[in-house]
Amino acid sequence: MDEISSMLDYLGIKSTEELFSDIPLSVRKKEIGIGSPLDEHLVLERARKYASLNSTEMLNFLGNGIYDRVIPEAVNYIISKSEFLDSYTPYQPEVSQGMLQSIFEYQSLISDLFKMDFTNASMYDGYSALGEAARMAYRINGKNKILIPESTYDSKLSVLKNYVWGLSMKIEKYKMNEEGKIDIDDLQSRIDGDTSAVVVENPNGYGVIDENVFRISEIKKESLLISYVDPISLGVLKPPGEYGSDIAIAEGQQLGIPMNFGGPLLGIMSFKADYVRKSPGRLIGESVDADGKRAFVMTLQTREQHIRRAKATSNICSNQALLTLAAGSYLSILGSSGLKKVALLTIKHSKNLAESLGNIGIEKVFDSISFSDTLFRIDKNVMLDLAKKGILGGIKLTSLIKDSKYSSGTFFTATEKTDNEKIKALVNALEVIM
Amino acid sequence: MDEISSMLDYLGIKSTEELFSDIPLSVRKKEIGIGSPLDEHLVLERARKYASLNSTEMLNFLGNGIYDRVIPEAVNYIISKSEFLDSYTPYQPEVSQGMLQSIFEYQSLISDLFKMDFTNASMYDGYSALGEAARMAYRINGKNKILIPESTYDSKLSVLKNYVWGLSMKIEKYKMNEEGKIDIDDLQSRIDGDTSAVVVENPNGYGVIDENVFRISEIKKESLLISYVDPISLGVLKPPGEYGSDIAIAEGQQLGIPMNFGGPLLGIMSFKADYVRKSPGRLIGESVDADGKRAFVMTLQTREQHIRRAKATSNICSNQALLTLAAGSYLSILGSSGLKKVALLTIKHSKNLAESLGNIGIEKVFDSISFSDTLFRIDKNVMLDLAKKGILGGIKLTSLIKDSKYSSGTFFTATEKTDNEKIKALVNALEVIM
Amino acid sequence: YEEPIIKDIKSSNTFSLSEQVDESILPENLKRKDLELPEVSEYDVVRHYTRLSQMNYTVDVGIYPLGSCTMKYNPKFADRVSAIDGFRNIHPFQPENTVQGALHVMYDLQEYLKKISDMDAVSLQPMAGADGEFTGILIVKKYFEDKGEDRTEIIIPDSAHGTNPASATMGGFDVVEVPSDDKGMVDLEALRAAVSKKTAAFMITNPNTLGIFEQNIEEIAKIIHNAGALLYYDGANLNAIFGITSPGLMGFDIVHFNLHKSFATPHGGGGPGAGPVAVKSFLKDFLPVPIVDFDGNSYRLNYELKKTIGKVSSFYGSFSILLRAWSYIIRNGDDGLKNVSARAVLNSNYLKKKLEKYYDIPYYPLKKHEFVLSTENTGKRALDIGKYILDNGIHSPTVYFPLIVKEAMMIEPTETVSKADLDNYADVLIEALKLSDEELKSRPKNTAVRRIDEVKAARDLKLKW
Amino acid sequence: YEEPIIKDIKSSNTFSLSEQVDESILPENLKRKDLELPEVSEYDVVRHYTRLSQMNYTVDVGIYPLGSCTMKYNPKFADRVSAIDGFRNIHPFQPENTVQGALHVMYDLQEYLKKISDMDAVSLQPMAGADGEFTGILIVKKYFEDKGEDRTEIIIPDSAHGTNPASATMGGFDVVEVPSDDKGMVDLEALRAAVSKKTAAFMITNPNTLGIFEQNIEEIAKIIHNAGALLYYDGANLNAIFGITSPGLMGFDIVHFNLHKSFATPHGGGGPGAGPVAVKSFLKDFLPVPIVDFDGNSYRLNYELKKTIGKVSSFYGSFSILLRAWSYIIRNGDDGLKNVSARAVLNSNYLKKKLEKYYDIPYYPLKKHEFVLSTENTGKRALDIGKYILDNGIHSPTVYFPLIVKEAMMIEPTETVSKADLDNYADVLIEALKLSDEELKSRPKNTAVRRIDEVKAARDLKLKW
């Protein structure tokens, strides 16, 4: 007798239909309408066909949040291990030490990279992490105003707005100067007794590396400093912990995670130790087991939704554990020297790119140092024409910030992969198009 | 101090150059000449570029030894696990039970599928396994003649010749009848006191399922019966153990191994228990450990080269362990019902293919049942023209057996994937070409 | 073995990029002082994580019957689909004509989710189940804002997942809890009493966290809708009812899916997940943007929803998870999905019957895909029994949830486990009762580490090396 | 835990192909009676092998210093290359114009192997190292047949790999063994005495299995060539001399490579390997067919070698292994390969020095990539110490080989292990000496199983379930 029959027998029923007798006939479904099952190899055939309709062999100058970077294959190997991939949230730590230790190491690596005290075990992406940071600031100081740079992209602002909507917080933009950096005077004038947090970006939404962010802690008064950074840039740039950040946020996709059409991503959140009990999400702590042996475990769960319910510091349940593993293994493989090299090459390539475009009369909008994304003055929308030539790039600033005054602003992005050959191909294509 | 410096210090030397002081200057190499190291991502870029020059999205009607079959992704998952992939020959069985048990299961699954007593832990490929079988036959009965069907492909014959060359054995072809099956009379007339083994194929080199192979054990006299079979066909066909085979050989690629441009492959060898001590290669046996617990271990190693050296039954060292894992997991996932379905669909599709080509006037060479490969009468060489239309197929028999009398013979191959849509595309293409 | 932390491993960095670059490219004032990441070989990193992997339980090693978490076997073909370069290496800002395959998959998935749920429009953007809830809450909020109604309360059953109240709070709503009745279903009288003009929505899981189907769901819908409020479906348990009924048929207005649960995408040790949200047509314009449209010719990202709440995450959702769910759905088709639910419910009821002589299994007896037992009648603690289970090489159930059952163990076998697995699991649970309290409290002892001092973890708070 | 054999696992088959087919398509007389493969779910198969995988040591878990086996870390990018669909899914009979990328890789690899070895022509066809040896032996045989000389003997040093004599015998040659001298090198006098008109070839590894470079290699070549015989290079230890010297410079006529050893392709638990053969120009025409040629425009399979031995395997070799080796070679380049050998030799000599105070390490003191110690002076058995090593979570060396060293342990650290690994390994080997014989004989005890009754395995001969 097959297993289903013998189970039905044991239950004293004739078919599984009977197990659904509690479902009112009035809500019964006729059919789903998806069709017949498709054999596994035909699923793969269809997937390969669809995938072939996506262009991946193009030269990539896209960025502004998602970057095409070198990912050591060992990172893919590690996150593909089913012992990690097909496990669940480590609710039973005795059999989950692998994941727990790897997250603890992620927390440590990011804290070292950011020079911050603590790092949580992940948010969904940089944008939602910024939203959570604003909520956290509110929990810390109860104030209502968030100041953000004018270079904040509309989509990021939209996510932030949604996160603070329930708190009725107010979001206000401060100005940037002609170098594309923080207008300190303008910002200073907006900081008042109701200011919960000042958000700074480095590099900012214009792609500019902004040393003015280092001075904000001096002028922020009672408010908190939330720094939104590029984690790769921290291979050389001053880290948020060195300039008085209270909370530091980043999008972690660049740390070993494929672009994947923009998801899943990794929201990084680090903060000062004092604020840990106000922090959202998950934390892994070190402790000992019954034999006194080092062991890792989820801690401060009393802040979390499964314990605290309506009073939790966030609703986070599934977060981005596997991607912390990617980031942790990426940072471990690159090491200080590797990450520094990647960051410096990025700056070098951005410089090469600007010089090469400059040679054909395409000027930078700002006379400042860019990290990955450089904003050029190009009136025409060149993106579709470039795509026809096998090149991806040319995002208009106005597609990211609708009412930006830099209406000719057009982005081209460099990473450590953007060698001179690729830049030359872009220059040649632009010469034809423009 | 970095690790290299401190090791050099410990050795009391200044550089690793000194460690090569024993190598005469007269044989010193100047440079290798391969060039500079290539960054990992550029290696992948180059590999992807080259791979894109191979056509994989074509409709595939190629076979004659290598087949494009459904491989459950779980098989790829299993053989990609680095715990198997990056391990070595299980010389230390206490830490290699995973591989040992999996090979033991492979031996068992194949023995059940073939209905033979024992199966060894792999040969390189079907052809070399046939060569080893001939040598084994010689070790068993000391006789000199091997009889093989006229439908044996030249490449297989060449490998066989090389394997028995050192033994000075004689290889003789026997005839096939007008149905493409063994000419029993001819074969019978060739079997004499010096005949070491009769090799039969089912399906044979013409693609034909040949019931005459079932009768050979009655006429083979003192010689051994070596059956070369298609392991997928055994999902429905009578297995070698049911018709008195002494040794059964197969190419195992079809059991979950990608085509990989023809390698690596898997040589399957099963045999009667009596002959085990004359068998080549590796064997895994069940035993117990010091606690009486079941344990697996390499056994009868005294036949092997690392112990017996010049008197070993073969020179096999690295064999195809990982591919036995593929075959074992493939057979376990498909099960009896799955393998039967695959075999029956193959026959059905071959029949559909023959009918469809028949409808446009392309006739089969033999009025017999084919398994995967069907031989058609087509004078023209259609292969390159078909390739231009995105179809792979049309191997000329004379490219496999140079002096075959069936000079118009042209193969088209079906598998469980060869649905009517694909057959229709072939028919349409052939109508244009012919 | 004890695996050192990566910082304590000593070797030499082997990562390399051959192009040279001069540090002076960046002015000193912008530079960091120092950087202290590990400098080890790739081999050491691979070994480190390989060893850690062997200290981690996975559904590929054994069954994982965590209630409500739906830890079924994740088929490998779906991983393969998501690994295809043509899907992995595309940038979200690529022109639409260069990502038609990706948009096609997303469009199809939207359609499939609509058919499965009988809802009218879908956004794939939320990044996890809880994020889907939050998105749903924002839609509720925007809907009433748009209508000019000031509704401040979300009603939630006492058996609900913790994410429900947490999400409601994030949206600025007050949470009103309603009790369950003696069948483990929503107490209709209590619900009627709780509903008012302040009620914005009622959030409910069906079948609920007790594994019991809320048979009064139509009445519930009527109560909620009559009050002018919205009915929200927490899709965590959707895998119990594929093809049998649907949130749309039951009268729900907003639904979130947990693709990683229902459609077998890997849980990744705690994410990433994917939490699409579906709504009835009158709420379509409130969905986050973009959604994927098809004009008969090509697929495009539609940002033009009139009353959209905007964005809840950076781009278009957890694309690599969406891919896997899409693969799973087309692989299964109608028949396959129906079988998923039938077998999940069969397994649950079979295991429940095997255990009911030993453990108290409260409330309505017919279960769906999961059930909750209480160890209270046995005198043993759920926690201790859970730890004993670990010692048997299998994973324990969810413990101490839902809160309305004392010493609760919430067991969801899922459809991919065999009868032999269930028999074995039952044996272990029954065997546990024969052990002394002392013995149970000493468990686990066959695991990588033994019981962990959680108090110390919270007190000393060591969150980095 | 003890993992059952797959046959003993009970569940239901989940494999499916939806197309229907009638059994009557095949006449009864052709059919088999019954078929008894397992009928289990894919999930159960995946679990089974996942569990088995955790009972298997791998280089990704720890170092694997098996002498002559060259178990270095296999970089993951090479696996990725071999997994690209454009390489995996091509058929060997595809027209050449549809496989130009594959042929390009093979051509490049032929060229690289020529440059590394200073030989003139390469066949990639042999499927493993021993198969390469057999191929080389066939070339020797054919060469003398072509010359009309009847040479029946192959000379082999007593320190040689077992495959050397076995391969020679397979080719129908008689094996003549020559002893090593007191430096662990070929005894030149003995070699001179052994050489005659019957000598077809001398097969030798350099550095040899003692890890010692044969410093008289030029004299050896002269002796062999003066006798009209051929000099054969067993490439198992080629990884010690990349860029320093080469078989071609040393005077060898035929070389086989072990790509899986020298160029870090995974060993697969005992295969597949790849054993290309290279020859000097005067032997090119004897190579197996086809080889890959380039006409300046496209790549083609050349079957037209005049005196070819024909074929030694079905098609063109272990293509997926060739791909990995190609990747490894271009990744490393000249500098990388030189560093591979330098570090391998450094590691070997470092470990040797750490151990020489405790163990007898005979023969010439300067080692290459590996060395052989003897436990004889310690009074312990090599086997016992090996088993103790396993208990420390690391793999033991090759034991009882080469045969000319009593109680031999042959240790090849490889270049990918760190100083910390070597220090730890030395500590374990030194620690072992402090244990009593009894204690050592009780090892291992921390492994999945303990010492296995090999006599029972051979006597009862249970080779199937």
Swiss-Prot record, chains A, B:
Highest rank taxon of the organism: Archaea
Catalysis: reaction(s): N(6)-[(R)-lipoyl]-L-lysyl-[glycine-cleavage complex H protein] + glycine + H(+) = N(6)-[(R)-S(8)-aminomethyldihydrolipoyl]-L-lysyl-[glycine-cleavage complex H protein] + CO2
EC number annotated for this UniProt entry: 1.4.4.2
Pfam families: GDC-P
GO annotation terms (biological process): glycine decarboxylation via glycine cleavage system; nucleoside metabolic process
Record flagged with keyword Transcription regulation: no
Record carries keyword Oxidoreductase: yes
Keyword line: Oxidoreductase
Database matches in SUPFAM superfamilies: PLP-dependent transferases
Enzyme class label: oxidoreductase
Gene Ontology MF terms: glycine dehydrogenase (decarboxylating) activity
Family affiliation: Belongs to the GcvP family. N-terminal subunit subfamily.
Assembly behavior: The glycine cleavage system is composed of four proteins: P, T, L and H. In this organism, the P 'protein' is a heterodimer of two subunits.
Annotated NCBIfam families: PRK00451.1
Function: The glycine cleavage system catalyzes the degradation of glycine. The P protein binds the alpha-amino group of glycine through its pyridoxal phosphate cofactor; CO(2) is released and the remaining methylamine moiety is then transferred to the lipoamide cofactor of the H protein.
Protein name: Probable glycine dehydrogenase (decarboxylating) subunit 1
